């Protein structure tokens, strides 16, 4: 079992994600917020045009189901899983996150695009790691109402789980945890 959580001292806001495997693989996350952003279960069909801001649309795209807030027709996913069984969750990481400005000659992915960008084109954690190593997680807000959220991420399939953090010292750090 792999569990990722973060709690601010004295704060009520905390999220926990977990992935464990017996004969099946289970992936999930809670959302410990005192208020709602209007989140709902959202299904993004195959080949949905996300309109990524700085990257081209992938040539193939998997269907995604998860919890999201819909703004201007765009699913702002909190956590989700694709049709291949790859799951991804964003968890609070306030005070630790650093998103870069757009970097020339890198694949620039906005923080709000990160979950669908990975899930629409990857089947496994290994494929996700390959894409993450080539990308820049950038600081472009979704809108004036939705600035970049201070999140770190858990990505999991039936064999492997990683944590992804965008921090100033090393840009993007990936922590691997082999499931038992």
At which residue positions do the language-model features occur?
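Accessory structured domains or lobes within enzymes
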Residues: 122-180
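Weak global preference for isoleucine
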Residues: 13, 41, 64-65, 70, ...
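A contiguous strand-loop segment
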Residues: 13-107, 139
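Alpha/propeptide regions of enzymes that mature by internal proteolysis
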Residues: 90, 104-138
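Short, Lys/Arg-enriched N-terminal segments with co-localized hydrophobic residues
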Residues: 1-13
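Short linear motifs in intrinsically disordered
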Residues: 3, 68-70, 140-146
């Amino acid at each position: 079992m792999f569990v990722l959580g973060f709690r601010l001292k004295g704060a009520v806001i905390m999220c926990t994600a977990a992935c464990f495997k017996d004969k099946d693989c289970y992936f999930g996350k809670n959302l410990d917020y005192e208020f709602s952003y209007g989140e709902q279960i959202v299904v993004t069909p195959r080949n949905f045009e996300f309109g990524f801001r700085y990257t081209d649309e992938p040539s193939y795209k998997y269907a995604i189901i998860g919890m999201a807030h819909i703004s201007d027709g765009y699913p702002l996913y909190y956590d989700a899983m694709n049709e291949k069984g790859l799951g991804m969750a964003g968890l609070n990481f306030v005070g630790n996150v650093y998103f870069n400005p757009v970097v020339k000659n890198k694949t620039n992915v906005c923080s709000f695009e990160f979950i669908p960008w990975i899930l629409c084109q990857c089947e496994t954690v290994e494929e996700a790691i390959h894409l993450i190593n080539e990308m820049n997680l950038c600081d472009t807000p979704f809108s004036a109402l939705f600035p970049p959220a201070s999140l770190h991420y858990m990505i999991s399939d039936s064999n492997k789980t990683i944590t992804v953090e965008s921090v100033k010292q090393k840009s993007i750090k990936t922590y691997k945890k082999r499931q038992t």
